Curated annotation (Swiss-Prot):
Alphabetized GO MF terms: ATP binding; ATP-dependent protein folding chaperone; unfolded protein binding
Residue segments, region Disordered: 603-641
Protein name: Chaperone protein DnaK
Annotated organism of origin: Methylococcus capsulatus (strain ATCC 33009 / NCIMB 11132 / Bath)
Upregulating conditions: By stress conditions e.g. heat shock.
PANTHER family: HEAT SHOCK PROTEIN 70KDA
InterPro entries: ATPase_NBD, Chaperone_DnaK, Heat_shock_70_CS, HSP70_C_sf, HSP70_peptide-bd_sf, Hsp_70_fam
CDD domains on file: ASKHA_NBD_HSP70_DnaK-like
Compositional bias segments (type: Polar residues): 603-613
Bias (Acidic residues) ranges: 627-641
């Protein structure tokens, strides 16, 4: 049976896991790391880099290196949080035709799901390399407080990456699965405090044994989808920029290269200050003016960092208190607090969590891997490998429609267990009204305009009648992914209209199909490029071995024979400069045949010693070619950077 992988698609880092023999296992990426930076870069020679390789070259390629894209997914360009982000990132955020926030690289506009799909494609490829088989299905996690548009956009990203997304689950719920699979813990009420790279979630979850099943019931959830480690980094960057402006009179905001260097240094400084009291940010040649180059040197203490981010940490208090209230619990009722997300490693955050819940948070759950592990467990449930687990998640925000006077009438309240269905009958607002517009909303405010608009559709051909007489039945149906379907039916005629909510923005079916095709083409280009590089590396090894043999034999090679070999060498070098893999392989074979005779002669003349050495070179260029490829290719790319 095909494997379903579990993916934590994070703002800063992503992680992939699988269930093996009933146990979850995090899969290392091709670089040997257990997490992959959620960074995608486009180079000058049209190469797409993902993960660590993209992060390494970010400083020299800031405008074409995309990070924290998850903060834009499913968002409108005019959103305040997007406008704030535009000022702080070195890449270009633009408004798409449908009003969504997209990015622009090299004159090409791209949707956030398209960029996230690149990260998913790498995770998929790494999982396939580990499993030795094709992966087609995945469970992907999202912040619990993601709205419908953001969930749909995440599902679109999976589809573009060639994955059938079997389930979208909430990150804190996944972390609870990872923590609570140890059945010896008994019945518990836990709080999952998830402060990641770009989002904050708090979920109150009850773990219990019910009729022999291990039941995970989400009692409530709350959060902030624009609060995370990236904001902590930005506070450090702003502080450094202000200090430098005071000292040098230069504003580094206008220099993308300087901003990228500052971002990297801010992240390192923040991490260092979790284990030390002071660090130094030292960036020589950060910029220059008419008087010459300028160097940046700023000392940052843990106390100063805590002062800079205090209000960000305090912003998590409100959602925590609301989640407890919605669950009908007090902090004393919570048995354990689980920390998820890299930002929870900050001592001040841990102190704050202890203050809110009155207990030490647990440190035995890996904050970087727990979510992916939970996703893998849910994948095991869907795949039938895990049989005694029941997961009851909730919808994070209320759902309803706009009614007379611009009011939002709720059909499904927040924290309702999903999947769920709700039906309500409405009528017309005017006499002889023959059509109604159903405006679908998500949020907690009273007025429609203050909530998130998910979409609109019309129900027409209603028979003329006085106002209030027609009966229009509106049904909201939320699936297990938290994605909404809405239908409206005229009870008199039976006429029905329905939509799967794709937001008033979002990607159209045609756009998704185009992006899927682009991704497939890109994968084919990757394969061809890999084969070409393998052929070049093999050829390079044969050239090296042949030159060495010629040098060692010296004047023992006849002029005619040397001329033939040198001609073959030059032909191969010419081919290596081009992109014709078949030609390179053909000329490599020709040179190998000619140089093989030389190797035999050298072996005979020198008693086998030098000959065996030469022979080993040929093997390096032959059957071992694939081993040579990655190492040499990586070095070349590093040099290019």
């Amino acid at each position: 049976m095909a494997k379903i992988i579990g993916i934590d698609l994070g703002t800063t880092n992503s992680c992939v896991a699988i269930l093996e023999g009933g146990k979850p296992r995090v899969i290392e990426n091709s670089e040997g790391a257990r997490t992959t930076p959620s960074i995608v870069a486009f180079t000058a020679d049209n190469e797409v880099l993902v993960g660590q390789s993209a992060k390494r070259q970010a400083i020299t390629n800031p405008k074409n290196t995309l990070f924290a894209i998850k903060r834009l997914i499913g968002r409108r360009y005019k959103d305040d949080v997007v406008q704030k982000d535009i000022k702080m990132v070195p890449y270009t955020i633009v408004e798409a035709e449908n009003g969504d926030a997209w990015v622009e690289v090299g004159g090409k506009k791209m949707a956030p799901p398209e960029i996230s799909a690149r990260v998913l494609m790498k995770l998929k490829k790494d999982a396939e390399a580990y499993l030795g088989e094709e992966v087609k299905e995945a469970v992907i996690t999202v912040p619990a407080y993601f709205n419908d548009s953001q969930r749909q956009a995440t599902k679109d990203a999976g589809r573009i990456a060639g994955l059938d997304v079997k389930r979208i689950i909430n990150e804190p719920t996944a972390a609870a699965l990872a923590y609570g699979m140890d059945k010896s813990r008994g019945d518990q009420k836990i709080a999952v405090y998830d402060l990641g790279g770009g989002t904050f979630d708090i979920s109150i979850i009850e773990i219990a044994e019910v009729d022999g099943e291990h039941q995970f019931e989400v009692l409530s959830t709350n959060g902030d989808t624009f609060l995370g480690g990236e904001d902590f980094d930005l506070r450090i960057i702003e502080y450094i920029v202000d200090e430098f402006r005071k000292e040098q009179g230069i504003d580094l905001h206008n220099d993308p290269l300087a901003l990228q260097r500052l971002k990297e240094s801010a992240e390192k400084a923040k991490i260092e200050l979790s284990s030390s009291q002071q660090t130094e940010i030292n960036l020589p040649y950060i910029t220059a003016d008419a008087t010459g180059p300028k160097h940046l040197n700023v000392k940052l203490t843990r106390a100063k960092l805590e002062a800079l981010v205090e209000d960000l940490i305090l912003r998590t208090r409100g959602p925590c208190e609301t989640a407890l209230k919605d669950a009908g619990l007090k902090s004393a009722d919570i048995d354990e607090v689980i920390l998820v997300g890299g930002q929870t490693r900050m001592p001040k955050v841990q102190e704050f969590v202890k203050e809110i819940f009155g207990r030490e948070p647990r440190k035995d759950v890996n904050p970087d891997e727990a979510v992916a592990v939970g996703a893998a467990i849910q994948a095991g449930v869907l795949g039938g490998q895990v049989k005694d687990v029941l997961l009851l998640d909730v919808t994070p925000l209320s759902l309803g429609i706009e009614t007379l006077g611009g009011v939002m009438t709720k059909l499904i309240e927040k924290n309702t267990t999903i999947p769920t269905k709700a039906t309500q009958v409405f009528s017309t607002a005017e006499d002889n009204q023959t059509a109604v517009t159903i405006h679908v909303l998500q949020g907690e405010r009273e007025m429609a305009r203050d909530n998130k608009s998910l979409g609109r559709f019309d129900l027409s051909d209603i028979p003329m009648a006085p106002r209030g007489v027609p009966q229009i039945e509106v049904t909201f149906d939320i699936d297990a992914n938290g994605i909404l379907n809405v239908s409206a039916k005229d009870k008199a005629t039976g006429k029905q209209q329905s939509i799967v909510i794709r937001a008033s923005s979002g990607l159209s079916e045609d756009e998704i199909k185009r992006m899927v095709k682009d991704a497939e083409l890109h994968a084919e280009e990757d394969r061809r490029m890999h084969e070409l590089v393998s052929a070049r590396n093999h050829a390079d090894a044969v050239v090296h071995a042949t030159n060495k043999t010629l040098a060692e034999l010296g004047d023992k090679v006849s002029g005619e024979e040397r001329a033939k070999i040198e001609a073959a060498l030059n032909d191969l070098k010419d081919a290596m400069g081009g992109d014709n893999k078949d030609l390179i392989e053909q000329r490599t074979s020709a040179l190998t045949e000619l140089s093989g005779k030389l190797a035999e002669r050298l072996y005979t003349q020198q008693g086998g010693t030098a000959g065996s050495e030469t022979h080993s070179h040929e093997k390096a260029g032959g059957s071992g070619g694939d081993d040579v490829v990655d190492a040499e290719f990586e070095e070349v790319r590093d040099d290019k950077r």
